[in-house]
Amino acid sequence: MSTNLIDSFGRKHTYLRLSITDSCNFRCLYCMPDEPFSSSSSSKLMSSDEIFGISKIFTEQFGISKIRITGGEPLVRHDFAEIIEKLATLQVSLGVTTNGVLLDKYFSLLQQNQIQLLNISIDSLDSERFKQITKRDLLPQVWDNIMQSISLGFKVKLNAVIMKGVNDDELLSLAMLSHNYPIEMRFIEFMPFYGNSWEKGKVMPINEMLQVIEREYSCIKLHDDKHDTSRKYKLSEDSKGCFGFITTMSNAFCGGCNRIRLTSDGKMKNCLFGAEEFDLLSLYRAGEDIGNLIKEGVWRKHKEKGGQFTEMNTVDNSKIINRSMIKIGG
């Protein structure tokens, strides 16, 4: 029988965000630090066996029922197929977060292992702007793979980080994707991480984003479950999909948080913004039990945003102790 992972505020944790690499074939400005960046050496990363072994402890001992595989860009890892095949043997819902460029190489693998959940980043529908944000001229490949994902029957969520003065003028065109296709289009508020030049003035909160969309459409509010990170709407009754807002900065969902994060170098983070890290990999490699450290790490979770800030108005990014987004895992 598994033990529930409960923090000191009574929140039960059933969802593991599992980063398998901090390498990426994009250089997105909201994710990568401004300074020169080097990926971790392979010796510092969890091996495929270690990823499976630690994940198995989370699922079998602690009742984790959902694992989202992230990066970096998880599909650039040379043994991605091996990792997928091992994790697929666990009694857990599996999904993958990706920038989409390499998806066409792995559709068969994902289908063979019953993985249907895909989160794909697309921050712009304009080729030049896409290149400005990602530093890569690869929008056609991403778009083609999104369309193929939909046609193959994957459950697709599209993610766009909205930044004022960068891509906020594309809200309507991105929202229209949820009308035309059976997807969930998610608009993410720009969040502060090490080296990403976050400024309050670049954040477009939910009320402003929704106001822009509602000038053109009478949006329909949908039901949100307790653990949902996205506040969901439809443009109209005949929309094929829906859209939503991930409101980490303006209206946090910490009260219903059920997530734990494991970085590619085997550190558990109990919060995306948390400064504390719990080194599971070193213990695991030493043959030690990691269960007590997992329980302790979850119990010590702060009430809100890693204890580093509460309101967006009080954020000083220079004083936040954290990794860059790519080092945490998307």
List the model feature ranges, each with a label:
Residues S8-D49, F62, L272:
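Canonical Radical SAM [4Fe-4S] cluster-binding loop centered on the CxxxCxxC motif
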Residues F26, S127-E128, A252, F278:
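Glycine-centered loop/turn positions within well-structured domains
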Residues L45, I51-I69, E73-I188:
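Radical SAM/AdoMet-radical enzyme domain recognition
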Residues P36-S41, D126-I133, F193-E199, D279-L280:
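A short acidic, helix-capping loop that chelates divalent metal ions and anchors anionic groups
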Residues M32, F107, T134, L272, ...:
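Short, flexible helix/strand-to-coil boundary loops that buttress conserved ligand/catalytic motifs
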Residues K12, R17, Y30, K66-R68, ...:
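Residue-level recognition of specific faces of alpha-helices
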Residues I20, M185, G266:
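Residue-level signature of catalytic and energy-coupling elements of molecular machines
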Residues S2-L16, N180, F190-F193, S197-G330:
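Auxiliary Fe-S-binding modules of radical SAM enzymes
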